[in-house]
Amino acid sequence: MPTINQLVRKGRTDKVWKSKSPALNKGFNSLKKKSTDISAPQKRGVCTRVGTMTPKKPNSALRKYARVRLTNGIEVTAYIPGIGHNLQEHSVVLIRGGRVKDLPGVRYHIVRGALDTAGVDKRMQGRSKYGTKKPKAAKK
């Protein structure tokens, strides 16, 4: 609890709000070669590296990730959800916000089924999250 004198000297400071996905809050004007403050729900980018990394302490796996250079010039690390993927260097992908709790520094997800990213094969439930089309009904 501050004293009255401390409050007179310093005062109360407002909490600074910080974005959880800052790369989506920057645009780029290619004609003027300047960054803009226009935010977007998703952004397009090109994969510069595709690989696997291991998660933090209690978990154990090989999580798939991609380094993506976005259209605004920022390079970010994005998680590739689902089982199996067709991404390689120079693939064009769409990223959305959303961190992966056990991978430090990964704040974005790649959208499956958009641009060069294929949907997850043989997925029956939760298909919309993995870009999988509805399977054809079996003939009787």
Swiss-Prot record:
Keyword Ribosomal protein part of the UniProt annotation: yes
Xref: SUPFAM superfamilies: Nucleic acid-binding proteins
Modified positions (3-methylthioaspartic acid) in chain numbering: 102
One cellular component term from this protein's GO annotations in UniProt: small ribosomal subunit
UniProt KW tRNA-binding keyword: yes
Gene3D superfamilies associated with the record: Nucleic acid-binding proteins (2.40.50.140)
Keywords noted in UniProt: Methylation, Ribonucleoprotein, Ribosomal protein, RNA-binding, rRNA-binding, tRNA-binding
GO biological process: translation
Recorded GO MF terms: rRNA binding; structural constituent of ribosome; tRNA binding
InterPro entries reported for this sequence: NA-bd_OB-fold, Ribosomal_uS12, Ribosomal_uS12_bac
Pfam families the record matches: Ribosom_S12_S23
Family per similarity comment: Belongs to the universal ribosomal protein uS12 family.
HAMAP family: Ribosomal_uS12_B (MF_00403_B)
Free-text function comment from the UniProt entry: With S4 and S5 plays an important role in translational accuracy. Interacts with and stabilizes bases of the 16S rRNA that are involved in tRNA selection in the A site and with the mRNA backbone. Located at the interface of the 30S and 50S subunits, it traverses the body of the 30S subunit contacting proteins on the other side and probably holding the rRNA structure together. The combined cluster of proteins S8, S12 and S17 appears to hold together the shoulder and platform of the 30S subunit.
Subunit: Part of the 30S ribosomal subunit. Contacts proteins S8 and S17. May interact with IF1 in the 30S initiation complex.
Protein name: Small ribosomal subunit protein uS12
Gene name per UniProt: rpsL
